[in-house]
C-alpha cells in the first residue's frame, strides 16, 4: 500500500511540475497535456485522444510559425541524394559500449554480425566529432539539462544520414538475420505498419529507431537545420 501511495505521489508531483514548466511555454498546451494525461490514467480514452490530437496540432502550428523561413527555403527543393554501395550502419550509445547494459551490448554485437559488407559505426560522446559537428549551444544545453540525450540522438542521426547516408539502428535493436540490401537501396527508408491511433504523431506510419537514406537527401538536410533552428531558440 505504501508503495502504491508513493507511486501516486510521484506521478502527481511530476504532473504538477510538468504543468508549471509547460505554462511558461503555453497555458493552452499545458492544459491539453494535463487533460491527455489524466484522461488516459482513468481510461477515458476518447477524451484523452481528443486532447492528444489537439496538443499535437498546436505543436505543429507552433513549429510551422517558428520555422516558416526554413520551410520556404526547402519547399521547392527536390534532391533525393546519392546512392552509394556499402553505405554505413550507424548506432549510438552516448556513454560508450563499455558502459552499456548487457542487453545493448548483445544488440550491437548482433548488428555487427548481420550487416555484411556495410561498416558499422558506434557513436558515443568521444567519437561523434570524428563524423559530425554539433553546435556549441546544443552541447551546452545537454550539459545543463535543457536538452536530453534522446533529443541529441535525434540530431546526431539526421546529421549522419544527411552527410554519409546509410542506415540508423537504435542500440536496442537485435538483428536475428542479415539486413536486406533493399534497406539501403531506397533514398528514404523507415519501418512502418498500418496507421493506428497509438499516442504518437506518426500513428506508426514511420519510425525513427530504424531510419535510412541516401547521402545528401534533402529531407535529412531540412530536418537537421530545423533541429538547429529550434534548439538555438528554445529551452526545452
Give names to the regions the model predicted:
Residues 155-164:
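Small-residue hinge/turn detector
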Residues 164, 169-170:
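Active-site acidic Asp-centered loop
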Residues 1-153, 171-236:
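Glycosyltransferase-associated regions of secretory-pathway enzymes
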Amino acid at each position: 500500500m505504501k508503495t502504491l501511495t508513493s507511486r501516486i505521489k510521484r506521478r502527481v508531483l511530476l504532473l504538477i511540475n510538468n504543468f508549471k514548466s509547460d505554462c511558461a511555454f503555453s497555458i493552452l498546451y499545458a492544459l491539453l497535456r494535463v487533460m491527455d494525461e489524466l484522461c488516459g490514467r482513468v481510461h477515458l480514452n476518447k477524451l484523452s485522444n481528443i486532447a492528444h490530437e489537439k496538443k499535437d496540432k498546436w505543436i505543429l502550428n507552433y513549429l510551422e510559425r517558428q520555422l516558416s523561413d526554413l520551410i520556404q527555403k526547402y519547399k521547392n527543393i527536390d534532391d533525393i541524394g546519392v546512392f552509394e554501395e556499402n553505405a554505413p550502419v550507424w548506432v549510438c550509445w552516448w556513454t560508450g559500449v563499455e558502459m552499456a547494459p548487457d542487453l545493448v551490448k548483445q544488440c550491437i554485437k548482433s548488428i555487427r554480425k548481420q550487416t555484411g559488407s556495410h561498416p558499422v559505426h558506434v557513436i558515443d560522446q568521444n567519437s561523434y566529432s570524428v563524423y559530425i559537428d554539433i553546435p556549441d549551444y546544443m552541447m551546452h544545453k545537454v550539459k545543463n539539462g535543457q536538452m536530453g540525450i534522446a533529443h541529441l540522438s535525434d540530431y546526431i542521426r539526421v546529421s549522419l544520414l544527411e552527410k554519409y547516408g546509410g542506415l540508423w539502428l537504435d542500440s536496442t535493436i537485435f538483428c536475428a538475420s542479415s539486413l536486406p540490401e533493399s534497406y539501403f537501396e531506397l533514398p528514404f527508408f523507415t519501418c512502418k505498419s498500418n496507421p493506428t491511433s497509438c499516442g504518437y504523431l506518426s500513428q506508426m506510419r514511420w519510425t525513427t529507431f530504424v531510419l535510412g537514406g541516401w547521402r545528401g537527401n534533402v529531407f535529412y538536410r531540412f530536418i537537421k537545420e530545423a533541429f538547429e533552428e529550434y534548439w538555438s531558440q528554445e529551452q526545452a
